[in-house]
Amino acid sequence: MTTVTTAPEAEYWLQTGWMEEPGAELGIHKPITIDRKTNLHEHRAYWCVRRAQDIFFSLLALIALSPLMLLTCIAVWIDSPGASPVFSQLRVGRNGKLFRLYKFRSMCPNAESKLNDLLQDNEMDGPVFKMKDDPRITRVGHFIHKTSIDELPQLVNILKGDMSIVGPRPALPREVAQYTPYEWQRLYVTPGLSCYWQIAPHRNQLSFEEWMALDVKYVKERSFLVDWKIIFATFRAVLFGHGE
């Protein structure tokens, strides 16, 4: 079944060439625009310097934010007694490599088993599940999710090399299993904490295909300048609540 986006941002993507004319087929029929081997060779120096930056800043952040992370662990433990404050989930990294992503628990312990009952209320098209008022989110979970505190354990993923500070968000295996060849291009880079989609105005109004187009756009455009622009825009979005 062909899906055509109707989001307000569609006109922008048409103008920038990241979407075909209305009525054209999207997804599997979008062209593969990135050669993975050439892309890697051309960015070798970039990868090395970026990895050094990731190690330095993740270590610095872990030290500076350790009191906040400890308080969060205590708050989550009090809110959900018996459940681990930090949980890990299998995600897909660069070139399809699987890794364990760490997060502070923002949902009830049996959240995965309740997912099937909520699929009918999914507010996102494509293979991704998103629900604004997800009943599985706990009281503390609402706060740490809104402020992105729940993502802080991923600094460990960055230090390990599973993730980077900037890059497309790591997807679940069940989501990647439904990717088209075009969407698979977002896996050519190391996943990160933030990317173009996270800083897009009204990001939750974007369709799945627009989200994927933003990630592929980053893979093509990435540079030190682009990365730092995304970092500063992410801080602004977290502090002032932009992007919802």
Briefly describe each language-model feature range.
Residues 124-190, 231-234, 238:
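A short, structured surface patch at a secondary-structure boundary
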Residues 2, 177, 181-191, 195-230, ...:
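Cytosol-/stroma-facing membrane-proximal "stalk/adaptor" domains immediately downstream
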Residues 41-111, 230-244:
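A hydrophobic, helix-centered structural microdomain
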Residues 22, 26-29, 86-135, 194-213:
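Short, glycine-rich, amphipathic interfacial segments at transmembrane boundaries or analogous
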Residues 48-51, 136, 148-151, 224-227:
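An acidic site on a long C-lobe helix of protein kinase domains
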Residues 56, 137-140, 213:
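Residue-level signal for cytosolic alpha-helical hairpin/rod architecture
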Residues 54, 150-157, 215, 227:
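Acidic active-site catalytic centers that drive phospho-/nucleotidyl reactions
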Residues 1-63, 184, 218-220, 242-244:
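N-terminal hydrophobic signal-anchor/signal peptide
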